[in-house]
Amino acid sequence: MAANKGKSQGSLVLHKVIMVGSGGVGKSALTLQFMYDEFVEDYEPTKADSYRKKVVLDGEEVQIDILDTAGQEDYAAIRDNYFRSGEGFLLVFSITEHESFTATAEFREQILRVKSEEDKIPLLVVGNKSDLEERRQVPVDEARGKAEEWGVQYVETSAKTRANVDKVFFDLMREIRAKKMSENKDKNGRKSSKSKKSFKERCCLL
């Protein structure tokens, strides 16, 4: 009998991550660095590119699905559809461009509006291009303060040097996993209380 080589891809837990942020902040560079261990400096923006990879998250084999959305205003109208499909979001700006940091508030509002029925949306604020410290326009304290105000984690990354690239994707997957577990627990709790109620009603009828 052949040894079981682990779960098939179809049966693996899938975590859906959406890359969000202004154009040119390095969303694609972060994605490609995480996926293929390579730094791509010039990348033509498209509506969205989708990537899927099998990874080991805290000892469990899972799949991550990454949707890399374009930051340009031209694509703002179709962004809502992408946001609906996401389970967690990396909200990316460039530490060398304060305008891209300011824009994160608007992107966050859009996410909250689209996911308004959900309680806590897994989201990390990511300050990319940390290798360009001499060109920094966004102080660490300012970015961290905004993230704290929103109740989320702030991490600085460099797609070029790969600093914290794995961290942001894995930390976000952990948040997504925790949310799914909490939701499943709630569902099971509701089912359990319904079955208890149903049992009591049947007992009363006897």
Swiss-Prot record:
Q: Where in the cell is it found?
A: Cell membrane; Midbody
Q: Where is this region: Disordered?
A: 181-206
Activity control summary: Alternates between an inactive form bound to GDP and an active form bound to GTP. Activated by a guanine nucleotide-exchange factor (GEF) and inactivated by a GTPase-activating protein (GAP).
Reply yes or no: does the keyword Kinase apply. Answer: no
Q: Which Gene3D superfamilies match?
A: P-loop containing nucleotide triphosphate hydrolases
Proregion span(s)? 204-206
Q: Which GO terms describe its molecular function?
A: ATPase binding; G protein activity; GDP binding; GTP binding; GTPase activity; ubiquitin protein ligase binding
Example GO CC term: the record gives: midbody
Which intervals of this chain are the motif Effector region? 43-51
Covalent lipidation (S-geranylgeranyl cysteine) residues? Answer: C203
Membrane topology value:
Lipid-anchor
Catalytic activity annotation: GTP + H2O = GDP + phosphate + H(+)
Residue numbers of Cysteine methyl ester PTMs: C203
| Pfam families associated with the record | Ras (PF00071)
For the protein in the UniProt heading, the enzyme class is: hydrolase
Q: Per UniProt, where does GTP bind? A: 21-29, 68-72, 128-131, 158-160
Task: Summarize what the UniProt record says about post-translational modification.
Answer: Prenylation is essential for membrane localization. The farnesylated form confers resistance to the proapoptotic and anti-anchorage-dependent growth effects of some geranylgeranyltransferase I inhibitors.
Alphabetically sorted, this entry's keywords are: Apoptosis, Cell cycle, Cell division, Cell membrane, GTP-binding, Hydrolase, Lipoprotein, Membrane, Methylation, Nucleotide-binding, Prenylation
Please name the InterPro entries in this protein's record.
Answer: P-loop_NTPase, Small_GTP-bd, Small_GTPase, Small_GTPase_Ras-type
A single Gene Ontology biological process assigned to it is: cellular response to exogenous dsRNA
Enzyme Commission number(s) of this protein:
3.6.5.2
UniProt subunit comment: Interacts with EXOC2/Sec5 and EXOC8/Exo84. Interacts (via effector domain) with RALBP1.
Q: What does this protein do?
A: Multifunctional GTPase involved in a variety of cellular processes including gene expression, cell migration, cell proliferation, oncogenic transformation and membrane trafficking. Accomplishes its multiple functions by interacting with distinct downstream effectors. Acts as a GTP sensor for GTP-dependent exocytosis of dense core vesicles. Required both to stabilize the assembly of the exocyst complex and to localize functional exocyst complexes to the leading edge of migrating cells. Required for suppression of apoptosis.
For this chain, the family text in UniProt reads:
Belongs to the small GTPase superfamily. Ras family.
User: What is the protein name given in its UniProt record?
Assistant: Ras-related protein Ral-B
What is the source species?
Mus musculus (Mouse)
